[in-house]
Amino acid sequence: MEELQGYLEKDRSRQQPFLYPLLFQEYIYALAHDRGLNDSIFDKPVEVFGYDSKSSLALVKRLIIRIYQQNYFLSAVRSFNQNRFLGHHHNNFFYSHFDSQMISEGFAIIVEILFSLRLVSFFEKKEIKKFHHLRSIHSIFPFLEDKLLHLNYVSDILIPHPIHMEILVQILQCWIPDVPLLHFLRFFLHKYHNWNSFLITPKKSIYVFSKENQRLFRFLYNSYVSECEFLLVFLRKQSSYLRLTSFGLFIERRHFYVKIEHLHMQHLLFIVVCRDYFHGTLWFFKDPSMHYVRCQGKAILASKGTHLLMKKWKYNFVNLWQYYFHFWYQSYRIRINQLANYSFYFWGYLSSLLKNYSTVKNKMLENSFLIDTVTNKFEATVPVIFLIGSLSKAQFCTVSGHPISKPTWTDLSDSDIIERFGRMCRNLSHYHSGSSKKQGLYRIKYILRLSCARTLARKHKSTVRTFLXRLGSGLLEEFFTEXDQALSLILPKKIPFIFHGSHKKHIWYLDIIRMNDLVNHS
């Protein structure tokens, strides 16, 4: 325990207090609310029931004044809870809802600024350059394509949510020693109407909290996941004969795309990748026997070693959650599978290993004989069932995959409808360019194309056949081109990463920095 304590204190030595006064600065809430300030850094603004920016700024000023008043926040939250429970929608409910959202967004902006400064300082100290070609989500698949061929076992791990908010506050306390700010956060989380139930009840409560407090929810969850992996590295160092001499670990930051290679040894490489935590985050390390990759709340643990080694790491995860985070996690949820007979879903692809059997005729002097060889091949395919499920939830088709019209888009112009469907189709083609089997992707494109035609026909109160016969089928052809022809319409074209001569099947592009919405919800 003393060694662990020293390990934690060493990495957390850089702390910056005095953040609490920033909650009373108007520009903090302007950063959280302004859509046009910098769309590449900040997420969508807080929706305030039709109020414009000037009115919202006035409300922020009133909020700051009321925070100064004693016991206001307590009464506001209590009023908000009662009114929501009773279904009342009046001025008090509006102000409380707005206050809750803005306080949540303001707190998240403050801590994001803190950790962004630390990240920039780390880059300057280590003289690390940001390689843009490593920003792409597809940059992980060549790694998997190269390493999985030689591994034996794999485990899917779903990282559980913490069961109590106090654990999250204690994690932040190790990084942010500003006591007033942490007390304010603790008070806000305790009094928020759905917080306690969100941590221990069905997914609906999690969904409500994450929707109303997106930035704060992501930051707290990623702080918890970062702490898990921080301790995981410690366990990795203690269990390895090839000790890591240095490493870096960051809380998942929005729009910081880096891949940092800290240490090269004869048989060891440790890599950290940070990505936009609203769409996907990579974090992985590898050594001769263990490989770990994570995307959001799902992790993949693969090994070249024995089943006993995988079992050891399985119980490392379970004990970490039970004894450090006080969360009871059943060990049977982590299943150990042989990679040769298992397919796993990761970042929009169904990945597996296929065995290729071939016979080679060998001739030596006057004798000839046949040699049977078996080679492994990395297979990444489009998960058709998952994508159809996402299309069904978005009301583009039925559960069985039958295309239907999109009623909510019938108020748009014809060009806007076609552009929306076309953009979805092109983005899917671009994102799944690495699939070795395109038949499933063609089916998804067909569903979107026919759904577009049905939507247009519904808007004009006609049938699909009559509508296409009147305007011509060429109307849709322009917007549903192949991925290679449509790249210039989406993003600046960049050189794809073609791995080991597999250009006919796997093409990994280096300009994909966000997960496709359909993939993210599948």
Curated annotation (Swiss-Prot):
Gene Ontology terms describing biological process: mRNA processing; RNA splicing; tRNA processing
Q: Name one GO molecular function term.
A: RNA binding
A Pfam family hit: Intron_maturas2
List the record's Gene Ontology CC terms alphabetically: chloroplast
Q: Which family does it belong to?
A: Belongs to the intron maturase 2 family. MatK subfamily.
Function text: Usually encoded in the trnK tRNA gene intron. Probably assists in splicing its own and other chloroplast group II introns.
**What name is this protein filed under?**
Maturase K
